A protein has these predicted regions:
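A short, amphipathic edge element
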Residues: 52-55, 130-142, 193-196
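Short, solvent-exposed mixed-charge patches
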Residues: 250-251
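N-terminal mature ectodomain segment of secretory-pathway/periplasmic proteins
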Residues: 21-104, 141
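Bacterial N-terminal signal peptides that target proteins for export
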Residues: 1-8
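Short, ordered beta-strand-loop transition motifs
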Residues: 63-69, 144-152, 205-206
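Residue-level detector of beta-strand structural context in well-folded domains
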Residues: 138, 143-144, 171, 200
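Gly/Pro-enriched, hydrophobic low-complexity segments
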Residues: 19, 27, 87-89, 97-101, ...
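Hydrophobic h-region of N-terminal signal peptides that target proteins for export
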Residues: 10-18
């Protein structure tokens, strides 16, 4: 999509046309990555400000697509977090529902909306970062262009329509112009950068351009988590009943 139109045209349409272009870019990015299901095994390196490194592993399964998907993320290592799991039920018109299962105490608990800014079990992902959101829950605006890892990108501001539905007041997306893959997300609270997520090692898997490495920077803590996606599959048969609280407890 070419957003560099003549100045006279912009004088006529104003900001509304600019916002429409931004929404189309984000929608195209989501459409190109859409699948009926997804599964992968992830290796995580959590690197603190003192360069101390801890290793974790999890499995991830998702059924459905953006805004109407369900997913379960389950730790498989190290032993102290093995079996800890998170169920996320996404919605098209509001924030997701989340439940966490802790096998050591055989208890599940609902994650309240106000708690989703906290770190997810010692990683630099917050609970909210693990959600999927529908584009209709946000307003978008093209800010310009930038280059991320050598790739030309659109720079797009995203703001939640319902301010209470997100810990972030705004985010800035960098979406690649060659394949519409999101290369970076910078998230802000009242204009202060709090988290940066970088996507790299992009491969085409089952005709979907897919980042195999996700790096999350927690700016305030000066720490980062590097997630490597392994054994990734799309559109494998899954059952809806495997994405319930009962399934979360079964393991």
């Amino acid at each position: 999509m070419n957003r560099f139109l003549v100045a006279a045209f912009w004088c006529l349409v104003g900001a509304a046309g600019f916002a429409q272009d931004a929404r189309q870019i984000v929608s195209e990015s989501q459409d190109r990555s859409r699948s009926r299901s997804q599964r992968y095994e992830g290796t995580l390196e959590v690197i603190g400000s003192s360069t101390k490194v801890s290793l974790k592993r999890w499995t991830y399964e998702r059924i459905g697509a953006f805004g109407a998907s369900k997913s379960i993320l389950r730790f498989s290592a190290p032993p102290e977090v093995k079996g800890v799991a998170l169920l996320i039920v996404n919605h098209t018109d509001r924030a997701s529902d989340q439940w966490m299962w802790t096998p050591a105490i055989e208890r599940d608990r609902r994650i309240a909306l106000q708690d989703r800014s906290t770190r997810f079990f010692g990683t630099d992902f917050s609970f909210e970062d693990l959600e999927e959101r529908d584009v209709n829950q946000y307003d978008f605006k093209v800010l310009g262009d930038e280059t991320v890892d050598g790739a030309a990108c659109w720079k797009i501001e995203s703001k939640p329509k319902e301010s209470k539905s997100s810990q972030y007041t705004s985010s800035v997306l960098a979406i690649r112009k060659d394949n519409y893959v999101t290369a970076q997300i910078e998230s802000f609270v009242k204009d202060k950068l709090v988290r940066r997520i970088r996507y790299s090692d992009i491969e085409k898997i089952d005709n979907i351009w897919t980042p195999r490495t996700v790096e999350v920077f927690d700016v305030g803590r000066n720490s980062r988590t590097v997630l490597k996606l392994e054994k990734l599959q799309y559109n494998t048969p899954m059952k809806d009943e495997d994405f319930t609280i009962e399934a979360l407890r079964r393991g």
